[in-house]
From Swiss-Prot:
Its main location: secreted. Antibacterial peptide. Acts on the Mycobacterium abscessus subsp. massiliense cell wall. Reduces 40-50% of the bacterial load in macrophages infected with different M.abscessus strains. Is not cytotoxic towards mammalian cells, and shows no hemolytic activity against human erythrocytes. In vivo, reduces the bacterial load in the lungs, spleen, and liver of highly susceptible mice intravenously infected with M.abscessus. Keywords: Antibiotic, Antimicrobial, Immunity, Innate immunity, Secreted. One of its GO terms (biological process) is innate immune response. Expressed by the venom gland. This is Polydim-I. Signal peptide: none annotated.
Length: 22
């Protein structure tokens, strides 16, 4: 379950890193 959660969070984390936030 942990691996699945990480795979689900991966795109979200990348989006956060790539998105310019103040």
């Amino acid at each position: 379950a942990v691996a699945g959660e990480k795979l689900w969070l991966l795109p979200h984390l990348l989006k956060m890193l790539l998105t310019p936030t103040p």
